[in-house]
């Protein structure tokens, strides 16, 4: 089968591989729509996961089941499915401990284009199909559905990790697709003031659509200073880190109130350390909590997020700005995420 792959660090190309084989609990899926992610860019061009050779990329897809293993009960060939980017091994001890994302090892719930070939192939393998797939509604646009698989679950996880309370003040650093879903999740959880940090006009408009009450442009000065000025020197209750570089943790610690929570859902693909400023951390005694987590996956979460879209709690249409048609456009769509033109939020390829 054909697939678009990481050939090595800074190397991309089309390759031929054997079609994957389904184990007794697994499924083989043919992608119907895929979306490149900035995580793919970190993986290929920063070597964030190491020097992977001939690994098919991609972890955001909806598709059609073409084969199931003998023990799969709830899905059959022909079913159209949502495939979460995180597909845990549900028989692992880490799942029993409450951390499905790290089943059988740190970040090992994220398998596609990490521990095995991803979804940018003519077919891809899904482990534990009954536990990791969700039925795709017939009338849901494919470009919206594929946003559930990563952008929605990741952004919402930022709001979950931040433990946003009714009326909480929140800063969301980065208003790309994940940050936009962080804003949407914060609003749904009852946040009061939601401050988005970003600069591209198309993202600013989308941030306001999803619930941002204020927008700060990092090009207009240090964002900590801007947040403090906006809040009369008090800072905010919660910070969601959804973009930016290694400096964002220091910024988040500086702008969150004592007793506040910082939630990181950003993929830090380069650098050896993330620095915590000593004084702003109260010399280690400010009761400022720092959390970071890979998004949850699995069938139940995918079904719940899907239903939020079906019942009009969240409109995902603002996330997708570029739609391509045809397998051969995957490379073009991926490089778009690297170049980040001003009119881009997310690109989707319909297959």
Curated annotation (Swiss-Prot):
Q: Which reaction does it catalyse?
A: propan-2-ol + NADP(+) = acetone + NADPH + H(+)
Q: How activity varies with pH?
A: Optimum pH is 8.
According to its UniProt record, what is one Pfam family this protein matches?
ADH_N
- Which SMART domains would you find in this protein's record? PKS_ER (SM00829)
* InterPro entries for the chain: ADH-like_C, ADH-like_N, ADH_Zn_CS, GroES-like_sf, NAD(P)-bd_dom_sf, PKS_ER
Q: Which parts of the sequence bind NADP(+)?
A: 175-178, 198-200, 218, 265-267, 340
Manner of cofactor binding, per the entry note: Binds 1 zinc ion per subunit.
Coiled-coil-forming residues are none
Uppermost EC category: oxidoreductase
- TM ranges are none
Its cofactor is: Zn(2+)
* EC assignment: 1.1.1.80
Question: Where on the tree of life does the source sit, at the highest rank?
Answer: Bacteria
Question: For Zn(2+), which residues are the binding ones?
Answer: 37, 59-60, 150
SUPFAM superfamilies assigned? GroES-like, NAD(P)-binding Rossmann-fold domains
Keyword annotations for this protein, in alphabetical order, are: Metal-binding, NADP, Oxidoreductase, Zinc
Q: A Gene Ontology MF term for this entry? A: isopropanol dehydrogenase (NADP+) activity
Write out the function statement from the record: Alcohol dehydrogenase with a preference for medium chain secondary alcohols, such as 2-butanol and isopropanol. Has very low activity with primary alcohols, such as ethanol. Under physiological conditions, the enzyme reduces aldehydes and 2-ketones to produce secondary alcohols. Is active with acetaldehyde and propionaldehyde.
State the similarity comment. Belongs to the zinc-containing alcohol dehydrogenase family.
Subunit record text: Homotetramer.
Q: Which PANTHER family match?
A: NADP-DEPENDENT ISOPROPANOL DEHYDROGENASE (PTHR42813:SF4), ZINC-TYPE ALCOHOL DEHYDROGENASE-LIKE (PTHR42813)
Task: Report what the protein is called.
Answer: NADP-dependent isopropanol dehydrogenase
Specify the species: Clostridium beijerinckii
